[in-house]
Amino acid sequence: MKFGWIMSSSSDIEERKDTVKDSLESSIPAIIVKKDEISTVRELGSIEIISDSLDADIVLVTKKDDLDILKSAKDSGKKTCVYITIETKEDEIYATKVSRLDFVDYIILEGKDWTIIPLENIIADLFNEDIKIVSLVNNVNDAKAAYEILEKGVDGVVLVPKDINEVKEFSKLIDSMNFENVALDYAVIKKIEPVGSGDRVCIDTCSIMEIGEGMLIGSYSRGMFLVHSESVENPYVATRPFRVNAGPVHAYILCPENKTKYLSDLKAGDKVLIVNKDGKTRETVIGRIKIEKRPLFLVEAEYNGEILRTILQNAETIRLVSDEGKPISVVDLKEGLKVLIKPDENARHFGMAINESIIEK
């Protein structure tokens, strides 16, 4: 996962406070501040503080400081970071040496009169090391370039923003870098039949979903159906674009990092994936889970000679997504229609994909 931090270059305390507020509003997780401003920043909101003080959440030192400070910080459960200005080849060597110390979690690299080459060298040298490489930049374009260097890119970026608009752009960039695209295909509907009542799960999120967006749900790990959000206008009830009526408690849902959970395990504060008709994803936070007894439909579809199944509530407002990317109500499903699925050859063990033979029916 890529991450981003903010650092203000202003000498005015009120402007630095505004930068903290802008960061909070844009969901930036951490900010670099002066040690005498830590208490002030904590009063403004909940954000990780990076500073040259043991009172910070991430303790920061420079090349000139005694690294033993970081040992003490690590012993007390703090995260640690070294800020290095790269001006010479010796600075590059120092950066790679410090990164191999077991009490250093992050290095921040600031370049003088360079952008890419030294970063490439350091990323390549530390490719297999357990260190987070962070680049300091002055604009969002340079942030994007840093994230993409040598395909792997830096783990994080510190942006010195000009204004709130740049902070917001930076936040959007981070989100886009962390999108997980999934490969969707279509399966052919073979059977739809009522199966009685059961405990059905509605996922109410903290995000507004658009037409073409939903979540990947299924009874089997090897094939999940794209269940559409309740964002479609209908004559029966008001839209609920924050909601996916997902199915019964037993079903799987695809979550970030290609993990699955049972619908029954979800709760407020958990993160799940919103997926659109093109396979593009974004994370969202669950605000509420509603489990209620409702009439259910069994849906069977064929993919590459195998039968995939899921169970959904029997209601007009519950929709899958056609192979053309259009929402289609479960009451309108017929044999021969094509719907979007995510096929998967892996089995699941505690939600993690494993290469193991498994029979699901």
Swiss-Prot record:
InterPro entries, alphabetized: DHQ_synth
Q: Recorded GO terms, molecular function?
A: 3-dehydroquinate synthase activity; dehydroquinate synthase activity; NAD binding
Q: Which reaction does it catalyse?
A: 2-amino-2,3,7-trideoxy-D-lyxo-hept-6-ulosonate + NAD(+) + H2O = 3-dehydroquinate + NH4(+) + NADH + H(+)
The keyword Cytoplasm belongs to this UniProt entry's keyword annotation: no
Write out the GO biological process terms.
amino acid biosynthetic process; aromatic amino acid family biosynthetic process
Q: Which UniProt keywords apply?
A: Amino-acid biosynthesis, Aromatic amino acid biosynthesis, NAD, Oxidoreductase
Its Enzyme Commission number(s) read: 1.4.1.24
Keyword Amino-acid biosynthesis tagged: yes
Q: Which family does it belong to?
A: Belongs to the archaeal-type DHQ synthase family.
UniProt function note: Catalyzes the oxidative deamination and cyclization of 2-amino-3,7-dideoxy-D-threo-hept-6-ulosonic acid (ADH) to yield 3-dehydroquinate (DHQ), which is fed into the canonical shikimic pathway of aromatic amino acid biosynthesis.
Q: What is this protein called?
A: 3-dehydroquinate synthase
Source species of the chain: Methanococcus vannielii (strain ATCC 35089 / DSM 1224 / JCM 13029 / OCM 148 / SB)
- Provide the gene name from the record: aroB'
